Curated annotation (Swiss-Prot):
Species of provenance: Limosilactobacillus reuteri (strain DSM 20016)
Known role: Catalyzes the ATP-dependent transfer of a sulfur to tRNA to produce 4-thiouridine in position 8 of tRNAs, which functions as a near-UV photosensor. Also catalyzes the transfer of sulfur to the sulfur carrier protein ThiS, forming ThiS-thiocarboxylate. This is a step in the synthesis of thiazole, in the thiamine biosynthesis pathway. The sulfur is donated as persulfide by IscS.
InterPro entries for the chain: Rossmann-like_a/b/a_fold (IPR014729), ThiI_AANH (IPR020536), ThiI_fer (IPR054173), ThiI_N (IPR049961), THUMP_dom (IPR004114), THUMP_ThiI (IPR049962), tRNA_STrfase (IPR003720), tRNA_sulfurtransferase_ThiI (IPR050102)
EC number(s) from the headed UniProt entry: 2.8.1.4
A Gene Ontology BP annotation from the UniProt entry: tRNA 4-thiouridine biosynthesis
Localization in the cell: Cytoplasm
Biochemical pathway: Cofactor biosynthesis; thiamine diphosphate biosynthesis
PANTHER family xref list: TRNA SULFURTRANSFERASE
Listed HAMAP family: ThiI
Underlying gene: thiI
Pfam family, one: ThiI_fer
Disulfide bonds: none
Record's protein name: Probable tRNA sulfurtransferase
Length: 406
């Protein structure tokens, strides 16, 4: 069956009151961005539904893109027919013939926005349901409460639209409706999941990745970019900000006691992330910390690290077990990349026994040994920004260096 359009139903947007229009407008922009490669597709974002006119585009390909767009509760492929009962009945019979191969229960559910149409919703439900029962007596039985199949009929000004399938969307809120966040992106399992969860709540993410050549390899940088590419399919594109961090790590290792290396390094990372957030008009910093998962992720450690900024530091996976984080990573296709064995700057210079309950005052005292302003300025002067789009391959750009490790 050649579908005419896809009817998209909103998720939480239906509860947004006076802000609903801005949320719907943003969702329309995001859907158009997700479907930009389909030249013939037209997107119409309306108050109660979003309609994607296929105009001959491949339904399966369009559907796979829509599944990744946050803010969509579900959607249904539909066909458009002339505004007559005869055309509606013929199309409905074709749908049943193609989709039903064993006895099932069903119901007809009609919405009518064109109140000039001669048949009202109650009459359409009864008349069309009776027609289908007569035509398929061995296949169909009515159940209005828990049917196996719901045949939806929408009577609009420009035609009648029929659908019988409902496909689950990504849920959440449209990316961009909650403002911009700076994600402290490592190459591990947790931070891509945290970024995904933040994006699902409407945050437009920019990735901040600290790299420390020669202590970290080109492979580690390429892996972080490829992880960002996996996440870009949820928002269209993501800016990746790489921050040189080797000088800071070397200086901290030289001047700070071993037990506080991790704490001071992370305080410097947070300072840099906050500086970038201000410069790039963000509203919050995100990271992948999970309470108690490793020695540096205690509440005392978080308190000592957060001391350097008054801006919000949000941790979407804070209360998740590792198994829960891994499950999400597998679902969003980042897990296999995350476990590739390339060290990032969070794992180099790691002391054997970091302080699990660092003292804030002591951390401040140790930092007096550092030229914090100079170190930060040189790091910020060396940043590089890459716009990462879905489908880009950063691993093959490093094929030679990867080959010896794979």
């Amino acid at each position: 069956m050649q579908y005419t359009e896809i009817m998209v139903r909103y998720g939480e947007l239906s509860t947004k009151g006076h802000n609903k229009k801005s949320f719907i407008d943003r969702l329309g922009v995001n859907v158009r961005k997700a479907l930009h490669s389909f030249d013939q597709v037209k997107v119409h974002a309306q108050r109660d539904r979003l309609h994607v006119e296929l105009n001959g585009a491949d339904y399966d390909q369009v559907m796979n893109r829509l599944k990744l767009v946050f803010g969509i509760q579900n959607f249904s492929p539909s066909i458009k027919v002339d505004k007559t009962f005869e055309a509606t009945a013929e199309a409905a019979a074709q749908m049943i013939a193609e989709q039903v191969d064993k006895p099932i229960t069903f119901k007809v559910e009609t919405r009518r926005s064109d109140h000039q149409f001669a048949i009202d919703t109650f009459e359409m439900n009864n008349k069309l349901g009776g027609y289908l029962l007569d035509k398929f007596p061995d296949k169909l039985k009515v159940d209005v409460h828990h049917p196996d199949l719901t045949l939806r009929v929408e009577i609009r000004l420009n035609g009648i639209f029929l659908s019988s399938e409902t496909i689950k969307g990504a849920g959440g809120l449209p990316v961009g409706t909650a403002g911009k966040g700076m994600m402290m992106m490592s190459g591990g399992i947790d931070s891509p999941v945290a970024a995904y969860l933040g994006m699902k709540r409407g945050v437009s993410m920019e990735m901040v990745h600290f790299f420390s050549p020669p202590y970290t390899s080109p492979q580690a940088l390429a892996k972080a970019k490829q992880l960002t590419e996996r996440l870009a399919k949820y928002s269209g594109s993501i800016k990746f900000i790489q921050v040189p961090f080797a000088e800071i790590q070397e200086t901290v290792k030289e001047k700070v006691p071993e037990g506080y290396l991790m704490t001071i390094q992370r305080r410097m990372m947070l300072r840099l992330a906050a500086a970038l957030m201000i410069k790039r008009h963000g509203l919050a910093i995100f990271n992948g910390e999970s309470l108690g998962q490793v020695a540096s992720q205690t509440m005392e450690s978080m308190l000592a690290i957060n001391d350097v900024t008054s801006y919000p530091v949000l941790r979407p996976v804070l209360s998740f077990d590792k198994t829960e984080i891994i499950k999400i990573a597998q679902d969003i296709d980042t897990y296999d990349l995350s476990i590739l064995p390339y060290e990032d700057c969070c794992t180099v210079f790691t002391p054997p026994s970091p302080k699990t309950r660092p003292n804030v005052k002591r951390a401040r005292e140790y930092e007096k040994r550092l030229d914090i302003e100079g170190l930060m300025q040189r790091a910020l002067d060396g940043i590089e920004i890459t716009e990462i789009h879905p489908g880009e391959d950063y691993l093959n750009q490093n094929e030679d260096v990867f080959a010896e490790l794979l």
